[in-house]
Amino acid sequence: MTDELKIEGYASLFWTRDLNDDVTAAGAFSDSLATSGAGGVKMLHQHDDAEPIGVWDEIVEDARGLFVRGRILRATPRGRLVAALVEAGALDGLSIGFRQVKARADGALRVLKRVELWEVSVVTFPMLPGARLTVVG
């Protein structure tokens, strides 16, 4: 067992409706990522900012959505717990924490055109069901 668990996946999928009736437009994260980079975005468990669980090494927008790659660190009790749950298949969701900068209504939907990305969490139930992670090492 290593001191870290490498994971990757999509934290957001463009033009895909989530369970809160939000849709994220392509490019919505570009300004935020240009300002903060991956290092400015925290890795949390269930959006709990009291105990970060790792670091995001890469966060990029591609044609599909917001791709993330990072390491869950076993140096903390919460990191060890989350890594074990991810390896067992009990946790595989990703969820974003953000501040809306620019959005528009489209019927019942809120289209997020520009957001300030604060964190990406490993979660049990993602608001966007397709936002999932995989273990890569």
Give names to the regions the model predicted.
Residues 36-39, 88:
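Structured helix-beta-strand junction loops
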Residues 1-37:
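Polar/acidic, low-complexity leader/linker segments enriched in S/T/G and N/D
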Residues 12-16, 46-49, 99-102:
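Short, flexible beta-strand-to-coil junctions
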Residues 12, 27, 31, 51, ...:
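Flexible, active-site-adjacent loop/turn segments at secondary-structure boundaries
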Residues 14-20, 49-54, 77:
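Short, surface-exposed beta-strand/loop "edge" segments at domain boundaries and coil↔beta transitions
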Residues 39-48, 94:
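Short conserved beta-strand and strand-loop elements enriched in small hydrophobics
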Residues 4-8, 58-137:
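Residue microenvironments linked to proteolytic maturation
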Residues 44-64:
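Short, structured beta-strand-loop surface elements
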